[in-house]
């Protein structure tokens, strides 16, 4: 009986711990993460203070913080080839990183670090030099900056069969030297690295290539981490938020269900299906059942996105900034529909898969510059600064904890729905106008459409909709309008 009670206690403690790792530790009603891909730490700090906090963003996913290999031309993916765990990259050094985390936390913006626990750098001719000046010999699995030697890695092999668990989790992903996370020493170095970031005030981690590591090894690592730092405004005993990259199309041996109890999981099916719908390959009317009925994870386990830094570069159904009208409609739906832990993308312009972030002649990442409307102009796309997207972050905050009600569709690609009595969204992806009296579920009054304009000093700079005493309003979205979506909420009442 005593053994049973002890086992039950340990089981419940483990369940409680994993549940806590699904909590993003947001401030107030904020509930959207933005991925400021390849931004410098000093620029993120300023963005937190001047743009993200005033517009209600909840957190920032940042690029990998550890020292990486220097590759010719400086492609973005060099950040995913670690040399050591020193906090020096093209985004800045440890002092600048710590300053950024502190300043963002001070204004209620949480920081989530993209971390590389699966591997170190791939092969390199001769001695490689990292962004902190550390030397390594990846071909010999020698990384003295940690230090790691060949005994800390799995034997080299290639992944040729994605249904072979051994290959997926112990062979080398695209030639990257595969760490042995079952080793006590490797575990200790990974935990030390993550704990240092927690000490500096981060709120959690995006775990790159999680499916390439055994779930039981990750469970041990996550469970060994320190609680979040109360000096950065986190409550006592708060656990780091974990979201894991697991690409699961439903037909491979290693599945997302092995990881979703340890933390949230990136729901790639969401990205693929929302792209198909707004590209016109699936009628929007079917989105009424969006979520688990589509084979997605439970809402609290799913990290959702229209595109990410990887799949936006691939051919296929995934939308990106190069299809702006459809991308804005998809993002509006993403942020309005009550499903998932939402993340929006902030990209830089690219012509091919390897395009580096905007940089100067010395290959230093340059800071974003803005026009008079606040949009980025020097190679940075900054989707998060598009009014149609940051306005929907405000919409999502305004309707938090409300249910989806009042669904309407025309049997095809025109839809609308309410979020309780606090918000209303309408979308037109047909080649003809949407012009109809629709139930907005809102209290009577005049509302500013936050997609086409902003509410400034009590006046709307875009479309406005008058809602009658029954909650109905006349909605018009022309097929040729600049935006194919309209959004109203209680905080945008004129």
Curated annotation (Swiss-Prot):
It comes from Drosophila jambulina (Fruit fly). The keyword Transcription does not apply. GO terms for molecular function: alpha-amylase activity; metal ion binding. It catalyses: Endohydrolysis of (1->4)-alpha-D-glucosidic linkages in polysaccharides containing three or more (1->4)-alpha-linked D-glucose units. It holds the Pfam family Alpha-amylase. Keywords: Calcium, Carbohydrate metabolism, Chloride, Disulfide bond, Glycosidase, Hydrolase, Metal-binding, Pyrrolidone carboxylic acid, Secreted, Signal. Chloride binds at residues 206, 308, 343. Monomer. GO terms for biological process: carbohydrate metabolic process. Its main location: secreted. This is Alpha-amylase-related protein. It is found in: Secreted. Residues 1-20 form the signal peptide. The active site is at residues 208, 245. Disulfide bonds join 48-104, 157-171, 376-382, 418-441, 448-460. The record marks 310 as: Transition state stabilizer. The modification Pyrrolidone carboxylic acid is found at residue 21. GO terms for cellular component: extracellular region. InterPro entries: A-amylase/branching_C, A-amylase_C, Alpha_amylase, Glyco_hydro_13_cat_dom, Glyco_hydro_b, Glycoside_hydrolase_SF. Binds 1 Ca(2+) ion per subunit. Binds 1 Cl(-) ion per subunit. Belongs to the glycosyl hydrolase 13 family. Its cofactor is Ca(2+); chloride. Ca(2+) binds at residues 118, 169, 178, 212.
